Swiss-Prot record:
Its EC number is 2.7.7.72. The gene is cca. Belongs to the tRNA nucleotidyltransferase/poly(A) polymerase family. Bacterial CCA-adding enzyme type 2 subfamily. It catalyses: a tRNA precursor + 2 CTP + ATP = a tRNA with a 3' CCA end + 3 diphosphate; a tRNA with a 3' CCA end + 2 CTP + ATP = a tRNA with a 3' CCACCA end + 3 diphosphate. This is CCA-adding enzyme. Its cofactor is Mg(2+). It holds the Pfam family PolyA_pol. CTP binds at residues 19, 22, 102, 148, 151. Keywords: ATP-binding, Magnesium, Metal-binding, Nucleotide-binding, Nucleotidyltransferase, RNA repair, RNA-binding, Transferase, tRNA processing. The keyword Metal-binding applies. One of its GO terms (biological process) is tRNA 3'-terminal CCA addition. A single active site specifically recognizes both ATP and CTP and is responsible for their addition. It comes from Bordetella bronchiseptica (strain ATCC BAA-588 / NCTC 13252 / RB50) (Alcaligenes bronchisepticus). PANTHER family: MULTIFUNCTIONAL CCA PROTEIN. Catalyzes the addition and repair of the essential 3'-terminal CCA sequence in tRNAs without using a nucleic acid template. Adds these three nucleotides in the order of C, C, and A to the tRNA nucleotide-73, using CTP and ATP as substrates and producing inorganic pyrophosphate. tRNA 3'-terminal CCA addition is required both for tRNA processing and repair. Also involved in tRNA surveillance by mediating tandem CCA addition to generate a CCACCA at the 3' terminus of unstable tRNAs. While stable tRNAs receive only 3'-terminal CCA, unstable tRNAs are marked with CCACCA and rapidly degraded.
Length: 364
């Protein structure tokens, strides 16, 4: 059933907005669709069976499709940071007013259920020109938009950033707006940027705006870091590996992880990757191989070790098959049998187990 003949929205003015419209114009696969409703009230939506899920402003789930429908709204700055907003969602808010509050022109295009575009801010022209441009001066009211700009630059590698948009970001940082960002919002955007096709562009945007030193002051950012995270993206590494490579040259990586409140898996890989890279350079002997396996807890966490090796392979040649065979060879050693052989002399167990593992590696 198309949205044009959906009884759930019959009589309502509904439009697809944001990323789904933008990506459709770019010929990219459509993700989740977001809808805006013009001329309705929360009571209207409730009568139709829509399920309210919004916190700060009215957002509803369609009773059948579970897609999100938000009432058209305007925003007014009422405090510092990304939470300092007052919203108005009256039935008199127009579609154009709703689009005007959005961040970038490419995200401020609407489409009717019949496929007609509504583009009061010339977003289609910017999509065609491959330009990321802020909608208006209200962009400066939300510092998260600096991070989002970096993420979009990482995702759309062939898009440039309008000079006036970069200038506005710099003014925002100079005004202290970036200092109001909370870790959860920074991590949300940074992690999504790392998972984009060109993560280095996110760092470039944040650095040029002056925001990188504010939101990630511990990070050591240079050409090597940027090249490595881009190679990680090309190789399809998961987030933990990309984050570990981001932090590889950062001495204060633990402090950075705590600041961002990064997931434990990401912080673990960031901590272990330098050890792995250093050890791999000198891992010709079974003793060096075993030290790396044990220090990385590869026997208990083989999947994490495998992911770690894949991240290390971005930096230096790694024979993944050989390392997997080594881990399996060490895991095959029966520690219980060795303990029984050393019954009565517990001090012999640890060296005997190590010797057995070294012998196994010698034949792996």
């Amino acid at each position: 059933m198309s949205r044009a003949d959906d009884p759930g929205v019959a009589g309502l003015q509904v439009y697809i907005v944001g990323g789904a419209v933008r990506d459709g114009l770019l010929g990219l696969p459509a993700g989740d669709r977001d809808w805006v409703v013009v001329g309705a009230t929360p009571e209207d939506m409730a009568r139709r069976g829509f399920i309210p899920v919004g916190g700060d402003f009215p957002v509803f789930l369609h009773p059948r499709t579970k897609e999100e429908y938000a009432l058209a709204r305007t925003e007014r700055k009422s405090g510092r940071g990304y939470k300092g907003f007052t919203f108005y969602t009256g039935a008199d808010v127009t579609l154009e007013q709703d689009l005007q509050r959005r961040d970038l022109t490419v995200n401020a295009i609407a489409r009717t259920p019949q496929g007609e575009l509504v583009d009061p801010l010339d977003g289609v022209a910017d999509v065609r020109a491959r330009v990321l441009r802020h909608v208006g001066e209200a962009f400066a009211e939300d510092p998260v938009r600096i991070l989002r700009l970096g993420r979009f630059a990482a995702r759309f590698g062939d898009f440039s950033i309008a000079p006036e948009t970069m200038q506005l970001c710099r003014r925002m940082v100079e005004a202290g707006e970036a200092d109001a960002l909370v870790p959860e919002r920074v991590w949300k955007e940074v992690s999504r940027g790392l998972m984009a096709q060109a993560p280095s562009r996110m760092l470039d945007v944040l650095a040029r705006a002056g925001a990188l030193a504010r939101v990630m002051p511990e990070l050591h950012d240079d050409a090597a870091v940027r090249a490595e995270i881009d190679r990680a993206a090309a190789a399809g590494l998961p987030l933990a590996g990309r984050y570990a490579l981001l932090c590889r040259h950062t001495p204060e990586r633990d402090a950075l992880g705590r600041r961002l409140r990064a997931p434990v898996e990401c912080m673990d890989q960031a901590r272990l990757l330098p050890l792995a890279v250093d050890a791999l350079a000198a891992s010709a002997t079974p003793a060096a191989q075993l030290d790396l396996i044990e220090r990385c807890d590869a026997l208990r966490k083989p999947e994490r070790f495998d992911a770690l090796l894949q991240a290390a392979a971005i930096v230096a040649p790694v024979d993944l098959s050989a390392w997997r065979a080594r881990v399996q060879a060490v895991r095959a050693i029966d520690a219980g049998a060795i303990a029984r052989q050393c019954a009565g002399d517990p001090a012999r167990i640890k060296p005997a187990l190590r010797q057995a593992r070294l012998q196994a590696l010698g034949g792996a």
